[in-house]
C-alpha cells in the first residue's frame, strides 16, 4: 500500500511539473497577466535556469512572493535541479 501511495504522489508531482513548465509566461501582448509581474531587477539572477515571476496575489504584507518558471529539464524552487526523470532528456 505504501508503494502505491508513493507512486501516486510521484505521478501527481510529475503532472504538476509538466503543467507548470508548459504554462506560457507571457501573453499575446507581452503581459504576464493580472496576478503575475516581472521580478524587479535585483532578482534578475534569482532563478538558476528559468524566469523569475512575481505572484502578486500570493504576497503577504511586506513579503513579496517570487517564484520561478523553470526552463525545460529543470525543476525545483529556483530551477537548480536537473530533472533526469524527464523522458525527453
Swiss-Prot record:
Main location: secreted
Gene Ontology annotations for the cellular component aspect, listed alphabetically: extracellular region
Subcellular location: Secreted
Domain EGF-like, first and last residues per copy: 43-80
Keywords: Disulfide bond, EGF-like domain, Neurotoxin, Secreted, Signal, Toxin
S-S pairs: 39-52, 47-68, 70-79
Protein name (database record): OMEGA-ectatommitoxin(02)-Rm1b
Similarity comment: Belongs to the EGF domain peptide family.
GO molecular function terms listed in the Swiss-Prot or TrEMBL record: toxin activity
Tissue-by-tissue expression: Expressed by the venom gland.
Signal peptide: 1-30
Domain of life of the organism encoding this protein: Eukaryota
